[in-house]
A protein has these predicted regions:
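Double-stranded beta-helix
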Residues: 131-201
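Short, conserved beta-strand element in jelly-roll/cupin
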Residues: 112-129, 187-188, 195, 217-221
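A short secondary-structure junction signal
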Residues: 102-107, 130-136, 145-149, 206-207, ...
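Conserved hydrophobic/aromatic beta-strand scaffold that supports enzyme active sites
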Residues: 6, 22-24, 119-123, 183-185, ...
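Non-heme Fe(II)-dependent double-stranded beta-helix
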Residues: 1-20, 25-114
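A short beta-loop-beta micro-motif enriched in histidine and acidic residues
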Residues: 107-117, 181-182, 188, 209-210
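Short edge-strand/loop segments of extracellular domains
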Residues: 98, 137-144, 218-223
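Non-heme Fe(II)/2-oxoglutarate
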Residues: 47, 193, 199-274
Length: 274
């Protein structure tokens, strides 16, 4: 991969993320870098398969080099630090090819994390409102503000009806079809990057072909007893590997890679080799 330059983030970025639940970085990857990511993505996908929904995923072993490249990229690290603080922990790099519509959903309806989780999505194909770009409801992540201020836990969530992707649309919330729910489209070109928490309500409709996405996922370092218990519970739900840091990160000469895994190791998550 070509050398990647750093791009600083300001307090405004943090406040924007906190208010609306997402950040958009246009052209964060150069055309040359994007072509390299596309080639790596396609190689990874050759190792995987498609599920019943037509979603293609690569294997963990096949993503090892891409994982290393992106986790050590200062731009990914800057975004994670801006949102989660300087002790963010690495979760995963995933390659996914979406071939069908993705219904409205957000993690907080079904799988709640006591620590904040950040998804940084790199899009490799042109996507607009007519071809399956991400649609979001700005501010809908505020259900997760309960993590920052317990008073939020007392507030009702008027959007709960569409947080579960398995909602039965035969009797749609508010009498609206899923495509009619008010939204903001986040149209992207290859090399653009979106950052958002899984608590943000999002979907994609009008898909006209595979939507190639690379996601880099980070976790706020669990500190409280509740957060630590919750992290271990999610790791168990994820087959015991979800939060196990890569061995090559733990042993790396790069201090930034060691730093984004040391917290999980200290909590007893055993490193895993590919």
């Amino acid at each position: 991969m070509a050398a990647l330059s750093s791009r600083s983030l300001s307090r405004d970025h943090f406040e924007r993320f906190r208010a609306f639940g997402f950040l958009v970085f246009r052209g964060l990857f150069t055309p040359e870098e994007t072509r390299d990511l596309q080639r790596q993505f396609d190689r990874v996908m050759e190792s995987g398969n498609r599920d019943a929904l037509g979603i293609g995923r690569g294997t963990d072993a096949a993503t090892a080099q891409l994982r290393l490249d992106l986790a050590s990229d200062s731009r990914m690290q800057d975004i994670a630090e801006c949102v989660l603080g300087d002790e963010y922990q690495f979760m995963s790099v995933n390659c996914t090819a979406y071939a069908a519509d993705t219904p409205w959903h957000a993690a907080s309806a079904v799988v709640q994390w006591a620590s904040r989780v950040l998804k940084i999505a790199i899009y490799l194909d042109p996507l607009d409102v007519h071809s399956g770009c991400l649609r979001v409801i700005p501010g809908s992540h505020r259900n997760s503000q309960r993590l920052l201020d317990p008073r939020w836990s007392l507030a009702p969530d008027p959007l709960f009806g569409i947080r579960n992707r398995d909602v039965v649309w035969d009797n749609p919330p508010w009498g609206l079809a899923p495509q009619e729910v008010p939204y903001m489209p986040l149209e992207t070109q290859p090399g653009d990057v979106l950052a958002f928490p899984e608590d943000l309500l999002h979907c994609a409709f009008a898909s006209k072909g595979p939507r190639r996405q690379i996601s880099v996922n980070f976790l706020e370092l669990p500190r409280t007893e509740e957060q630590i218990f919750d992290a271990k519970l999610h790791n168990a739900w994820g087959g015991g590997r979800l939060l196990r840091p890569p061995q090559d990160f733990v042993d790396s000469d790069d201090p930034s890679l060691r730093r984004m895994t040391h917290g999980l190791v200290a909590l007893g998550f055993e490193p895993v080799a590919d």
